[in-house]
Amino acid sequence: LYIIYFITAQGWTMREITLLAPAKVNFSIDVTGRLENGFHTVEMILQSIDLCDIVTAEKTQKGVSVSCAQHYVPNDQRNIAWKAADAFFKACPEQGGAHITIKKNIPVSSGLAGGSTDAAGVLKALNRLYGEHLSREKLLGLARGLGSDVAFCLEGGTQLARGTGDELTALPDLPGVNLVLVKPDY
């Protein structure tokens, strides 16, 4: 967690924050049913891992912008990180705006929740940057509105996920588990 403060006439003010957004793995998944909307209900054991994207949020006067060096990651409202920032500012309309920078380390389309963890990172960063206006419950509500994995990525750790994957129960940390990830180039 990196925080940059600036001195203003009113004292120190936070201008920018950088944090790690960890990937997740599914240790188990059981499909328990199907909803009318076509989604399946599940029970899963999920785990945050040390592979992380880096998310930086910088205060701006208004609006949302996103930048990511990888050409295949959209830098507009198609990006879930942009959607997360937009949701935050709709929930806190009295706040300003933000420029979000994402450094991708999590492979895209790998099932490791790279986009979801970036969205969760944006919610955490903006809430911290703008003075913790939203409670944990409110942040989880925003996360659930963005996608099932976003709620898990906001909480992290080891979790039992039920429903569509966004009903979470914390589990004890898994002791001494070593994990090797392999991502083929195809």
Model-based region annotation:
Residues 1-13:
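Short, Lys/Arg-enriched N-terminal segments with co-localized hydrophobic residues
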Residues 100-108:
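Membrane-embedded alpha-helical segments that form the functional core of polytopic membrane enzymes
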Residues 89-101, 125-145:
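Phosphate-handling active-site elements
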Residues 15-20, 26-44, 132-186:
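ATP-dependent small-molecule kinase catalytic core of the GHMP/sugar-kinase superfamily
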Residues 15-96, 109:
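N-terminal beta-alpha supersecondary unit
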Residues 81, 110-136, 152-156:
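DPxDG-like acidic metal-binding loop motif
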